């Protein structure tokens, strides 16, 4: 029997010039690995190098080495991390595979060039450049025409294939498109971004199917899938008995937590949306309806392009079970399965180490970080005492909490 541990972690907040989160993040991951004690451990990373990747990508090999040192039980490491930010196909994705010596003789790695499995020899291999042509990895950035209206980003996927005790595993790291604007979900098509995520993941699944090489692998897709809540049902839940008020561009307001009260005399409201609504509206406010003049403009929720300010953000986090049903994007992928989610949203957590147990007021809470699998994999995992959870709740891991799935086969 082999104990497996799969982790996905968006590490975009980890890479800053001061590297202040490195030590706590490494300890948080190492503690989870120690508690599970797997023989085969894979961690998928997104946004390696962070937002300041030209400055901070040099930190990536350092943190890989430090994590490896913190996991002395593993004798073999295969690390594939795309930090070649000057390359056209740059994705900032990473896959780190740690294997115990006791499993070496029962593990082989697929060579996508020769289409053959090869035994593992060298104990440590770290590759950070030239992954497009590296034989043990498939890495692609999503085609530019997937989203022609915005700047071509670094979203894409990375695949490794392994044979472990005669079972074939495909581990796929995917980073799907995010929600560019909170307002677009109200002004335009509420499924605007989820439809593009579906297109991207369907593309990945089709590519994987074409490269199965005569087998049906146990497929695990785990990464920052950027799944978001159904905006209509979630907003209806939060804003019951409120009225929606678009706010003109020049209107500037602070946080609702600071006691925001909108003044009817100073507020310019567009009551008849038109063709130029996106251009003229900077925010949408949901205000309580009341017969009292003092409270009729009381703001429950204010939404801007990159702001989601609920009047009681702590309650929003504490009551996460009340909106679990609004997490529906997995329904778009009938061939993929997931263990039951019983953990809080994984995004957007505070990036401040002094205030790490709160959500930022940038986006609606969401379960962005997921582990999906095909039916064959799901059937085996179900019988293997699975545990599916997020972790790092007491420490700052950046704006995403890592998610893990452990099981035995």
UniProtKB/Swiss-Prot annotation:
- Which domain of life does this protein belong to? Eukaryota
Catalytic activity reported: 1D-myo-inositol 1,4,5-trisphosphate + H2O = 1D-myo-inositol 1,4-bisphosphate + phosphate; 1D-myo-inositol 1,3,4,5-tetrakisphosphate + H2O = 1D-myo-inositol 1,3,4-trisphosphate + phosphate
tRNA-binding recorded as keyword: no
Recorded hits in InterPro entries, A to Z, give: Endo/exonu/phosph_ase_sf (IPR036691), INPP5A (IPR039737), IPPc (IPR000300)
Give a GO molecular function annotation for the protein. Answer: inositol phosphate phosphatase activity
Q: List the disulfide bonds.
A: none
What are the protein's UniProt keywords? Hydrolase
Example GO BP: negative regulation of epidermal growth factor receptor signaling pathway
PANTHER family according to UniProt: INOSITOL POLYPHOSPHATE-5-PHOSPHATASE A (PTHR12997:SF2), TYPE I INOSITOL-1,4,5-TRISPHOSPHATE 5-PHOSPHATASE (PTHR12997)
What the record says about family reads:
Belongs to the inositol 1,4,5-trisphosphate 5-phosphatase type I family.
The protein's name is: Probable type I inositol 1,4,5-trisphosphate 5-phosphatase
Q: Which gene encodes it?
A: ipp-5
């Amino acid at each position: 029997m082999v104990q497996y541990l799969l982790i996905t972690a968006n590490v975009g907040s980890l890479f800053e010039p001061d590297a202040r989160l490195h030590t706590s993040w490494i300890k948080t991951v190492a503690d989870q690995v120690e508690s599970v004690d797997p023989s085969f451990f894979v961690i998928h990373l997104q946004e390696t190098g962070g937002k300041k990747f030209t400055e901070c990508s040099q930190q990536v090999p350092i943190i890989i080495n430090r994590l490896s040192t913190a996991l002395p039980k593993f004798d073999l490491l295969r690390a594939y991390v795309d930090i070649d930010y000057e390359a056209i196909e740059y994705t900032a994705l990473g896959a780190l595979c740690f294997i115990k010596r006791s499993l070496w003789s029962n593990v082989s790695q697929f060579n996508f060039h020769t289409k053959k499995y090869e035994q593992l020899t060298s104990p440590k291999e770290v590759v950070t450049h030239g992954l497009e042509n590296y034989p043990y990895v498939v890495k692609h950035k999503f085609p530019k025409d997937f989203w022609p209206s915005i700047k071509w980003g670094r979203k894409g996927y990375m695949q490794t294939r392994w044979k472990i005790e005669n079972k074939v595993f495909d581990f796929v790291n995917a980073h799907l498109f995010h929600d560019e604007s909170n307002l677009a979900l109200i002004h335009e098509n509420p499924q605007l971004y989820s439809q593009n995520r579906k297109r991207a993941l369907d593309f990945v699944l089709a590519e994987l199917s074409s490269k199965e090489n005569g087998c049906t692998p146990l497929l695990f897709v785990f990464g920052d899938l950027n799944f978001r809540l159904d905006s209509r049902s979630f907003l209806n839940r939060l804003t019951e008995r409120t009225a929606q008020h678009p706010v003109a561009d020049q209107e500037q307001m602070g946080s609702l937590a600071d006691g925001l009260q909108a003044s009817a005399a100073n507020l310019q409201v567009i009551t008849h949306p038109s063709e130029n609504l996106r251009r003229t509206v900077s925010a949408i406010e949901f205000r309580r309806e009341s017969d009292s003049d003092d409270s009729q403009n009381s703001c429950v929720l204010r939404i801007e392009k990159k702001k989601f300010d609920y009047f009681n953000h702590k309650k929003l986090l504490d009551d996460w079970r009340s909106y679990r049903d609004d997490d529906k994007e997995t329904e778009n992928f009938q061939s993929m399965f997931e263990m039951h989610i019983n953990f809080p949203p994984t995004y957007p957590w505070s990036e401040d180490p002094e205030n790490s147990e709160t959500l930022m007021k940038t986006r609606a809470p969401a379960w962005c970080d997921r582990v999906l699998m095909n039916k064959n994999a799901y059937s085996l995992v179900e019988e293997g005492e699975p545990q599916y959870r997020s972790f790092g709740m007491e420490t700052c891991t950046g704006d995403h909490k890592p998610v893990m799935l452990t099981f035995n086969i």
